[in-house]
């Protein structure tokens, strides 16, 4: 009992004692490519054999020239963080690619621990059309920030219709520049992207700093938050005491009279901490109870490293089943 009480208090205190997220973050831009950026540019599939070797695999990020340019920006702006950008496109399309965000963090992020080399956290990535949802998940795992720049918009005619070019594609107009080497300010309190001196508001970035995402950033990654919530809930339920959560409340989206998709039905049936009778719809952000863990197209040694980092000997003693598919990275399995 004392152990459970101590665990519940320790989880709450260890989180609340963490430093708050910096109100202002200075960044210097680096355009990685124009158009959508596939995660294969960040971590090529033909280099999958080296993904568990962080130092070696980091050498395949984009190109050797790009790596040199990023290093030059870091030397020119030692007090700023490099923000990797997909100009006129979306960052991270195609897959979640944990090794991709690992590489971005290695070159542009912060060292997680001075005792563990080549493992970095807190990268900052951006795209004119934002971050691919599946890639945003892995950005959150590293405590990173994903920015929807909206720096190009469709040019409209007098009737409000997009003006097309000779290829029948919409003509775009630039609302502000993120040319490589541009210094910008991210205000995490007002949730705005500003000019270097903070005088001009460029775009609202509230979607990048929801209460849940702010927790991930503050904790240096989503794993610590998820595990903390699980342990605190378990301790309180076992002791029969009220949960005094230090974490952001769940986001519950409920639309009266609206039916449920198949996925929403499964989600509702397994939601944790939701009042009886509450029906949740898309956009909700709550914990769920799972009994099957699946991982598609997985690099086996990376999974082993993740489990080691969690001090885990098994995937979970509570799930009914777990699987991994090797897919095109099967060659790295022993």
Task: Please name every model-derived segment.
Residues 7, 194-199, 206-263:
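Internal alpha/beta core interface subdomains
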Residues 12-52:
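Small-residue-rich anion-binding loops in enzyme active sites
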Residues 1-6, 11:
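Single conserved hydrophobic/aromatic residue that forms the stacking wall/gate
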Residues 256-280:
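N-terminal basic/disordered segments at the start of proteins
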Residues 35-42, 91-103, 212-231:
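Conserved phosphate/anionic-ligand binding catalytic regions in large, soluble enzymes, centered on
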Residues 38-43, 47-59, 64-65, 69-82, ...:
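Long, structured ligand/cofactor-binding scaffold of large enzymes
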Residues 7, 41-194, 201-208:
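Feature captures the catalytic cores and cofactor-binding loops of soluble hydro-lyases/lyases
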Residues 38, 46, 50, 65, ...:
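Structural signal for hydrophobic packing residues in well-ordered secondary-structure cores
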């Amino acid at each position: 009992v004392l152990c459970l009480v101590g665990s519940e208090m320790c989880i709450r205190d260890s989180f609340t004692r963490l430093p708050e997220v910096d109100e202002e973050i200075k960044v210097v831009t680096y355009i990685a490519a124009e158009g959508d950026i596939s995660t294969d540019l960040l971590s090529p599939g033909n280099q999958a054999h080296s993904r568990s070797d962080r130092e070696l695999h980091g050498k395949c990020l984009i190109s050797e020239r790009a790596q040199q340019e990023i290093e030059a920006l870091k030397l020119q702006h030692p007090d700023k963080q490099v923000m990797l950008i997909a100009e006129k496109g979306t960052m991270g399309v195609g897959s979640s690619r944990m090794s991709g965000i690992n590489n971005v963090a290695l070159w542009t992020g912060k060292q997680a621990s001075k005792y563990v080399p080549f493992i970095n956290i807190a990268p900052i990535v951006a795209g004119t059309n934002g971050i691919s949802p599946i890639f945003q998940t892995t950005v959150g795992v590293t405590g990173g920030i994903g920015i929807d720049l909206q720096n190009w918009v469709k040019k409209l005619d007098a009737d409000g219709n997009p003006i097309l070019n000779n290829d029948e594609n919409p003509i775009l107009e630039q609302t502000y520049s993120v040319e490589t080497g541009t210094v910008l300010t991210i205000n995490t309190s007002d949730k705005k992207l500003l000019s270097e001196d903070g005088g001009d508001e460029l775009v609202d970035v509230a979607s990048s700093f929801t209460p849940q995402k702010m927790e991930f950033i503050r904790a240096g990654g989503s794993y610590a938050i998820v595990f903390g919530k699980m342990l605190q809930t378990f301790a309180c339920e076992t002791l029969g005491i009220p949960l005094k959560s230090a974490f952001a409340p769940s986001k519950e989206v409920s639309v009266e009279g609206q039916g449920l998709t198949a996925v929403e039905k499964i989600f509702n049936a397994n939601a944790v901490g939701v009042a009886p009778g509450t029906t949740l719809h898309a956009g909700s952000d709550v914990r769920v109870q799972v009994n099957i863990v699946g991982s598609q197209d997985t690099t086996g040694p990376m999974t082993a490293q993740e489990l080691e980092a969690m001090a885990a000997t098994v995937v979970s003693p509570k799930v009914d089943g777990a699987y991994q598919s090797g897919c095109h990275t099967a060659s790295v399995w022993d």
